[in-house]
Amino acid sequence: MPSETITPLLAHRARTNIQWFTHKHMRQVSRLNAKQHRVNMMTAENWSIRDELVDQYKTLFAQHLSPRHLSYADGMGGDAELLQAAADFFNRVFAAHSRVQPAHLVVGAGCSSLLENLLYDICEPGEGVLIETPFWGGFETSFVLRSNVTAVHVRPPCHGNGSADLDRLVSAYIEAYERALRQAPCRIKAILVCNPHNPCGHIYPPRVIQALLQFAQRHDLFYISDEIYALSTLDEQTAFTSVLSIDVAALGVDLARVFTLYSISKDLGSSGLRLGFGITQAHPDLRLSLAISNHSRVSTFTSLVITALLHDPEAATAILHQNRAALQRSAKLISDFLAFHQIPFVPPAAGVYVWARLGWRSSSRPGDEPSWDEEARLNDRFEAAGVSVGAGQGYCASEPGWFRITFAIPREELVAGLRRIEQVVGMEGQKWTAI
């Protein structure tokens, strides 16, 4: 008998993944393990209409639950009724130019899971995807852990929401992408466009989308459009344009290279139900591979309730309208707070967060720009004050001091979180009044 227990060794890829993840997400892991209560303004969840959704889901379960919903889902790619309801939803709400058919769709356990599977299918290990900075840090987890894909950074112009000179904006965008492609350390297979943008909250003008589609065609790349915040718009003047609504053939673009991601996590405030949609309208082999990878990954309970909701356009429209109204109120509240304290921020046109330079006064040298170390220390001070926000370095921001602040939380928590931020970065004892 051996005198001591020997722990079996994990595979090299598992050990490599653990090392990468703990280094990349050490702060988030520490926060999850912490016992001190913090106002969570880091996680991009949508609490704006949770009570309304719970009531709606209870009713739908009571009306539609049957013994068959305790079985595996039928069909490849997802439950047939859900695929039909989703196709109708995309055609109606996203104004699809080429009608979305159930055979174009695959359901999975959220957008991240589908993106991970997609990258595994289109990229060889070590190949790259062009992605604009700053970007949500969770994208890298989908890139790295299974597929070993490299995120190749693109630094486009900061255009906010709209531009007075659209021609110049389009030109600057394409120049930034061409430069990143030329300088890439690996072969590039795709571009990933997050529209509306995470974390900046801007919406891409149609002409920028069209130019990026043509860029992808010119360089034989896949065009991946993550549209998870598509219906969480905040600015009535800035309309969202889905890639599904664009006549790509008229641009000389092959529809087979276009892939769209969507989920119920944000617009329907249901991140815990784990349901996302992948749409490929002219690449049946890709659709089949994704269907195989995601077979029976979505709970039939989730399929049941979302199928019933999407089958009722009036109910779905009402929920989405309530969501937008609630998000607009919260966005105004946090924008007023930032403006009161003269903190630079990007006015969000969509999403559940704001991109703000909370660290603009954190430099130890008056008048100088803050450093990355100072950003990290400021983040520690936020944590100590009982509020969690997303520091810009985790989003590959180009300059220190930026933070992503989620505002789609209950109003009492939102005000409490802003008070704690105020304690850390407030100026000369000024106290903002919530209206």
Curated annotation (Swiss-Prot):
Chain positions with N6-(pyridoxal phosphate)lysine modification: 266
Keyword NAD recorded: no
UniProt keyword Transferase, yes or no: yes
Sequence intervals crossing the membrane: none
UniProt enzyme class: transferase
UniProt record, GO biological process: amino acid metabolic process; gliotoxin biosynthetic process; mycotoxin biosynthetic process
GO molecular function, one term: transaminase activity
Coiled-coil stretches: none
Signal peptide limits: none
Cofactor(s) needed for function: pyridoxal 5'-phosphate
Pathway where it operates: Mycotoxin biosynthesis
Record key words, sorted: Aminotransferase, Pyridoxal phosphate, Transferase, Virulence
Xref: InterPro entries: Aminotransferase_I/II_large, Ethylene_sulfur-biosynth, PyrdxlP-dep_Trfase, PyrdxlP-dep_Trfase_major, PyrdxlP-dep_Trfase_small
Induction: Expression is also regulated by rsmA.
E.C. numbers: 2.6.1.-
Entries under CDD domains matching the protein: AAT_like (cd00609)
Main function: Probable aminotransferase; part of the gene cluster that mediates the biosynthesis of gliotoxin, a member of the epipolythiodioxopiperazine (ETP) class of toxins characterized by a disulfide bridged cyclic dipeptide. The first step in gliotoxin biosynthesis is the condensation of serine and phenylalanine to form the cyclo-L-phenylalanyl-L-serine diketopiperazine (DKP) by the NRPS gliP.
Family: Belongs to the class-I pyridoxal-phosphate-dependent aminotransferase family.
The protein's name in its UniProt record: Probable aminotransferase gliI
Source organism per UniProt: Aspergillus fumigatus (strain ATCC MYA-4609 / CBS 101355 / FGSC A1100 / Af293) (Neosartorya fumigata)
Top-level taxonomy: Eukaryota, Fungi, Dikarya, Ascomycota, Pezizomycotina
Gene: gliI
